[in-house]
Amino acid sequence: MVFRIASSPYTHNQRQTSRIMMLVLIAALPGIATQLWFFGWGTLFQIILAAVSALAAEAAVLQLRKQPIAAILKDNSALLTGLLLAVSIPPLAPWWMVVLGTVFAVIIAKQLYGGLGQNPFNPAMIGYVVLLISFPVQMTSWLPPHDIAATAPGLLDALQVIFTGHTASGGDMNTLRMGIDGISQATPLDTFKTSLHAGHAVEQIMQYPIYSGMLAGAGWQWVNIAWLIGGVWLLWQKAIRWHIPVSFLVTLAVCSTLGWAFAGDSLASPQLHLLSGATMLGAFFILTDPVTASTTNRGRLIFGALAGLLVWLIRSFGGYPDGVAFAVLLANITVPLIDYYTRPRVYGHR
């Protein structure tokens, strides 16, 4: 009789990688639908461009590496990378930007390290940061939600802006970014940071149309709630574990509450931090990436808490209004160290 000697762990989750990735894609539907509702058809076009680019880039690299193309593409990891990048960029960003970011994410941040399971950094966030640093104007040109927009682009207008930079009537991004008050709009976090630097008081800032009397800004509050719903469904399906999203959100809430209590005239409120920007997307869909996150339960708690702290620090004192992507990548750097000091003790060893 021949016994096969295998290394630990000896218990395994029977779900295949493709199944888990598909669950994440399904869980993203509420967030995608909400972004489509508030920001228009551009989000859908960006997702399609990113998906095609991700599959094509991965297939090309697999062909060069003489790897089985069909079998690897079926794991859905390339699709998920493209999706996460597409929903993170402005819906009317030029078509070549999402293609460039997706190709960079798949080829450089994933396949260059050996493919799925070998990459130390989240590929989608690598692609996002490359685009943000290289094209800061285009990457911060978010449309105002449709309910406060002076002009809401339709299906054909969105398609034309993405591929030509202009609508059928000759309008451009500057026109489309105008709010009902005739002022060019930005995201709630960007508006808050920019207005503070301009010397405006917090009470005055929160009266801007972008906030519309809501806790965290028109549109963005509901987008984050939608991503939260998808994240809770992932927890219920046991596709992800609770440690990272809970520690991330708790740390962000605690830091922002303390900051707001002691410096409310210069720092954002907890509800703005929790329900604006990419908070819920990052908590449940990006930080929980099993490849680039910590692998122990204690390590996951530390990893999530570190990311939450970094998001608050970057948003409050850094040069970028959101900071989730940078926080994720900085936390990814610490994963080997976290895992080293939180790995379970082997029975019988000190």
UniProtKB/Swiss-Prot annotation:
InterPro entries: NqrB/RnfD, RnfD_bac. It is a multi-pass membrane protein. It is an enzyme of class 7 (translocase). It is found in: Cell inner membrane. GO terms for biological process: electron transport chain; transmembrane transport. The modification FMN phosphoryl threonine is found at T187. Its cofactor is FMN. Its EC number is 7.-.-.-. One of its GO terms (cellular component) is plasma membrane. The keyword Chaperone does not apply. Keywords: Cell inner membrane, Cell membrane, Electron transport, Flavoprotein, FMN, Membrane, Phosphoprotein, Translocase, Transmembrane, Transmembrane helix, Transport. It holds the Pfam family NQR2_RnfD_RnfE. The chain crosses the membrane at residues 20-40, 42-62, 68-88, 89-109, 123-143, 215-235, 244-264, 267-287, 301-321, 322-342. Belongs to the NqrB/RnfD family. Part of a membrane-bound complex that couples electron transfer with translocation of ions across the membrane. PANTHER family: ELECTRON TRANSPORT COMPLEX PROTEIN RNFD, ION-TRANSLOCATING OXIDOREDUCTASE COMPLEX SUBUNIT D. The complex is composed of six subunits: RnfA, RnfB, RnfC, RnfD, RnfE and RnfG. This is Ion-translocating oxidoreductase complex subunit D. It comes from Citrobacter koseri (strain ATCC BAA-895 / CDC 4225-83 / SGSC4696).
